Amino acid sequence: MKILAIRGKNLASLAGDFEVDFTVEPLKNAGIFAITGSTGSGKSTLLDALCLALFDSTPRMTKARESKVELADVRNKTIAQSDSRSVLRRGTAEGYAEVDFIALTGETYRSTWTACRAGGKPSGILRSVGFRLMNLSKNTEEQGTRKELLAKVSKLIGLSFEQFNRSVLLAQGDFAVDDAALHLAVKVQRIRDISDSVRFFVGVGDQQGVLVQLALCKAQLRKNAAVVQLVP
């Protein structure tokens, strides 16, 4: 699996249309690089767009399910923070997240997540999430329900949402050795799973480092493995 482009519109801190194209310079041959910027500039939102377009969810939304926080919406309604539509920028009527990628089959696909409000107005109630999957190599659209299409995407890229989070996004603090909530056996298995996923993704992903924080991952894995080895 190789990511070719990330696009979106009106998502959280990123207003209007945006695009990151890895098929043109300076990113085409950049190798590993950093996404930097001040707080609120859209770094995390860019990663959210990637996840939404592939999985209709993000790591932050997964964590929000535990807290069950409700956010204020229009017309005195609320929306769960864990709802993927909550990423739609306030004061806008529509938004989308889109990713072009090369699947394990070698074919190029485009997955698109959309959110909109009734009547095309910022004051309209939220409509159901839309999801499309196009086979760009064959110029055909995959058919199925949103759930079926999401399952298709996971199969095409060879990673589930959980595996993607562990081996690609590597959310900060997820592998902390001093996390009391994780038993040693769970830590060991997680290290094995992540290690396998990272080797796999880098191998087929042409070492595209925009999101694969490889150096950080390897350092943390070595640290965790060293701690595990100290246990009789």
Where are these regions (language model features)?
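Extreme N-terminal "head/tail" segments of very large remodeling/mechanoenzyme assemblies
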Residues: 1-166
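Acidic side chains
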Residues: 21, 48, 180-183, 193
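A short, flexible beta-alpha/helix-coil linker loop
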Residues: 28, 174-175
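Short, compositionally biased segments
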Residues: 176-185, 232
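Alpha-helix boundary/capping motif
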Residues: 184, 188-190, 194-197, 207-209, ...
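Aromatic (phenylalanine/tyrosine) cluster motif
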Residues: 200-201
